[in-house]
Amino acid sequence: MLNADYGEGDNLSANAGRFSEIITGYDKNGNIEGLKRSGKSSSTTYGMIDNLTLTYDGNQLKNVTDAATDPLYNGVFNFVDENKGSGTEYLYDSNGNMQQDYNKKISKIQYTLLYLPTTLQFTNGNRKDYTYSADGRKLKVVHKTAIANISVPMGQIKELAASQVSQTHTVDYCGNVIYENGSLNKVLTEEGYATLSGTTPTFYYYLKDHQGNNRIVVRLNGTSWNTEQVNHYYPFGGVFEVNTETSGKQPYKYNGKELDRMHGLDWYDYGARMMDAALGRWHVVDPLAEKYYSISPYVYCGNNPVR
């Protein structure tokens, strides 16, 4: 992919370019070298929210710089150049798994033998702990939010005392049944999901596009339908700021995958590994990399996300 031009109306001339995404270059292995993204820059204006330059050490991401001004609009899906440095911002282990991210302030990620994250630690004390079955199915995630003024050095993981945790959010995955903080949250179905209030179920249904992206979520209300969520996407899965949501957060979005936005992570969980939609790449080597010698093992879907 090179250009994804946004427009509305029959000839796409209305609001042209509001949510366009342009790839300005690739290296010989297919790694993205430049990316420009437009979006909502304030509550009333639109413009460029990302102007990224990516540099590599082989196929491993080394540094990302952003020449655009970060948007003022709250909740914008964009790349945040927190480090604003020219040195190495991403560090990897000997198996090619990203361990440190200076822009997301990830001090360290620990992995299982299947290269799935078990602990993801942020420098401000926030962390995520994952539990899997023996075959790699995700069973549980514990999101911990630290109190203010906690500092974790890069390369380290810190066990917080109970008094240092301001909030804990636990999600259990029991097949198609999802529990949050010990209470039943939803039951996933082929068409969407159901929630329970007492013994009364409420059914929600997805309207998908040709890629399996959940575009609209509707709720069955007696004999009528209520629109609960509308999603629009950038080519690599970033979400538009004009998306609407009326009944709490429904995280299954691009390709029907779960988007984790807590603590600013903004990664999609594809099961075998997680995808960074802001950069259009994985941070873990493709388990089937030996079948695709001609392209980087970190590239997402051969750089053709809309086919």
Task: Spell out what each predicted region is.
Residues 222-239, 263, 271-273, 277-307:
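Short turn/helix-capping motifs enriched in Asx and small/polar residues
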Residues 48-92:
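Extracellular/periplasmic ectodomains of large secreted or surface enzymes and adhesion receptors
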Residues 23-24, 52-54, 90, 109, ...:
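A residue-level detector for well-ordered beta-strand positions
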Residues 18-20, 48, 84-86, 103-105, ...:
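Short, small/polar residue-rich loop motifs at catalytic or cofactor-binding pockets
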Residues 5-12, 25, 38, 95, ...:
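Primarily recognizes Gram-negative and organellar outer-membrane beta-barrels
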Residues 6, 38-40, 68, 144-148, ...:
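Acidic glycine-/aspartate-rich tracts in secreted/extracellular proteins
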Residues 179-185, 190, 195-271:
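A motif-centric feature for acidic-aromatic and gly/ser/thr-rich catalytic loops and repeats
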Residues 1-11, 20-35, 55-63, 76-77, ...:
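A short glycine-rich beta-turn/N-cap micro-motif
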